[in-house]
Swiss-Prot record:
It is a single-pass membrane protein. Disulfide bonds: none annotated. It is found in: Plastid, Chloroplast thylakoid membrane. It comes from the Eukaryota. GO terms for cellular component: chloroplast thylakoid membrane; cytochrome b6f complex. This is Cytochrome b6-f complex subunit 5. GO terms for molecular function: electron transporter, transferring electrons within cytochrome b6/f complex of photosystem II activity. One of its GO terms (biological process) is photosynthesis. Pfam families: PetG. It comes from Spinacia oleracea. Component of the cytochrome b6-f complex, which mediates electron transfer between photosystem II (PSII) and photosystem I (PSI), cyclic electron flow around PSI, and state transitions. PetG is required for either the stability or assembly of the cytochrome b6-f complex. The chain crosses the membrane at residues 5-25. The 4 large subunits of the cytochrome b6-f complex are cytochrome b6, subunit IV (17 kDa polypeptide, PetD), cytochrome f and the Rieske protein, while the 4 small subunits are PetG, PetL, PetM and PetN. The complex functions as a dimer. Keywords: Chloroplast, Electron transport, Membrane, Photosynthesis, Plastid, Thylakoid, Transmembrane, Transmembrane helix, Transport.
Length: 37
């Protein structure tokens, strides 16, 4: 039961982590464009 619980937490954190990295990279990309302009 504990292994299944930890596995569920990992599966839940992976999409959140990927989404956070994507948003951070997107904001930095937009910020870079604004500085270039």
């Amino acid at each position: 039961m504990i292994e299944v619980f930890l596995f569920g937490i990992v599966l839940g954190l992976i999409p959140i982590t990927l989404a956070g990295l994507f948003v951070t990279a997107y904001l930095q990309y937009r910020r870079g464009d604004q500085l270039d302009l």
